[in-house]
């Protein structure tokens, strides 16, 4: 069963690509037609490829590994933050810092610094320093929080990236590819699909299109995590029965 309906994709404007003169020829297999100088994405292919991507993300999420949501453009940032938070996943919605993946140990130091300042605010340290020092530390924490807040709880590299607008997030793409981290992405008609492992041909500019796709990814993660918990609970419930059966078998011997 598909995760999407063709009608909802049409309503969200998923099919609207960029001006034909701005296209990437490598997107030709995913384009249905040109209308009034604008490329129209083949939604039948989007349906199939989106399902493939979501099934793969489901498998990753069930392992307990994290999927990083990335989208820093104006139309995407609030959606990325809200849906990633709902799914309990790390996210980047303000600015991608160079080395966020390839130099993760240094990024972790910045996160520890941010958390250290936060502790100072609650453990009484702020009461022992000057007003100027408090202000400087508060500003430092605010800046770090704005950029790193979405990955504050991330302790290791993500198992995959889900990206909105691969042209804008080219640094994230480059870092993930260098580390062999799978990339799932909405890919518009002006982008190179060969940069991505799981292509979802879609309008990456319209808010409703972004919302539809990002929500679907978050829903997939939430459901996969819930299934994992359910399976673990069932396994724990079955364990005593297995132990009892083994004990009975040993006694019979």
Swiss-Prot record:
| InterPro entries hit by this protein | Ribosomal_uS2, Ribosomal_uS2_bac/mit/plastid, Ribosomal_uS2_CS, Ribosomal_uS2_flav_dom_sf
* TM regions (residue ranges): none
Please indicate if the UniProt record lists Ribonucleoprotein as a keyword. Answer: yes
Q: Name one GO biological process term.
A: translation
Q: Which Pfam families does the record match to this protein?
A: Ribosomal_S2
Which keywords does UniProt give here?
Ribonucleoprotein, Ribosomal protein
Question: Source organism's superkingdom?
Answer: Bacteria
* GO annotation, cellular component aspect: cytosolic small ribosomal subunit
From the UniProt record, which GO molecular function terms apply?
structural constituent of ribosome
Q: Which family does it belong to?
A: Belongs to the universal ribosomal protein uS2 family.
Q: What is this protein called?
A: Small ribosomal subunit protein uS2
Q: Recite the lineage of the species.
A: Bacteria, Pseudomonadati, Chlorobiota, Chlorobiia, Chlorobiales
Which gene specifies this protein's sequence? rpsB
